[in-house]
Amino acid sequence: MKKAEVLALIPARGGSKSVPRKNLLDVAGKPLIAYSIGHARDCSLVTRTIVSTDDDEIADVSRRFGAEIPFRRPAEAATDTATDLQVFRHALLFFQERGYTPELVVHLRPTGPVRHVHLIERAIGLMLRHPEADSLRSIGLAEQTPYKMWRIEGQYLQQALPLEGFPESHSMPRQKLPAVYHQNGYVDIVRPRTILEMDSMVGHTVLPFVVEGKIHELDYPEQIPALAAAVERWQRGEPDPEPEKHRHSA
C-alpha cells in the first residue's frame, strides 16, 4: 500500500513584534524553529517538511535543521494581519503548479517547541482513517466556561454566549454545563481541498484531537524563562509540575 503524502508546513515570518525575531531565539541551546522542524522530521508519517518564510536568515537556519525552503513567502502573506489561509493557499498553489498535491497538510506552529511525536502521528492516523473529515484541530478543555461570561453593552451587561435550554447558565453549577474546548495549536491538520475548494482552514467536518496538559508556547517576552525550562524538562523526559488546584464556587 502506497504511503500517504503528508506535508508538514511550518509558517515562520521574520517580522514578529511581541518577541522580535522569536523564531530564531535560542531556547535551551537551539533556535526556536528547530524544534518544530525536528518534530516533523522525526514523524514517521510525514513525507515532506517545509518552512514558509519571507526571511533569509530563517530560511538558512531552517535548511540547516533539515527543512525545505521551496519558495519565499510573498510580502502580502507575511504581514501582521495575514491569515493562515493566505499562507497555506500560497504554498498549495505553488506545489499544485508543479504537480504535487499532498493528501494532508500538517500545521506545526514554530512557537510551540514542546511536542511528542507520537501524538502528531496519532493525529495524522486519525485523519487518514476519516477521509470524510475536512480537518483536525487539537484542543484542550477550557478552564473557564464561556456560558458564564458577559459583554458590556452601553451601561449594562449582556450574557456573552446564551445556551439554549439553559436560560440562566451564568448562575448554574459549572459541572452541569456542557464541556467546552479551546484550540491549543499543538497540531492541526487540513486537507488541500478544504483550503483550495472551500476557502477555509477547517471546512465543515472537523475532527477533535484532545491534548491534555499544559501547552508551552512563546507569545510574549516574559514567557521565555518558563518556556526554556519546559523544553529542558521535555529533553530530559521529565513531566511538567502539577498545576495548582483552583477551587471553583458553584
Give the residues covered by each predicted segment.
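Conserved core of the sugar-phosphate nucleotidyltransferase
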Residues: 86, 113-204, 210-212
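Short active-site oxyanion
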Residues: 45-50, 134, 214-215
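A short, N-terminal amphipathic alpha-helix
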Residues: 32-48, 64
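N-terminal nucleotide-binding beta1-loop-alpha1 segment
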Residues: 1-20
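Conserved SAM-binding loop
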Residues: 25-26, 51, 107
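Conserved alpha/beta core of the MobA/IspD/sugar-nucleotide pyrophosphorylase nucleotidyltransferase superfamily
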Residues: 2, 178-250
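Hydrophobic targeting segments
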Residues: 5-10, 33, 48-51
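Short phosphate-binding loop-to-helix
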Residues: 57-106, 115, 121-125
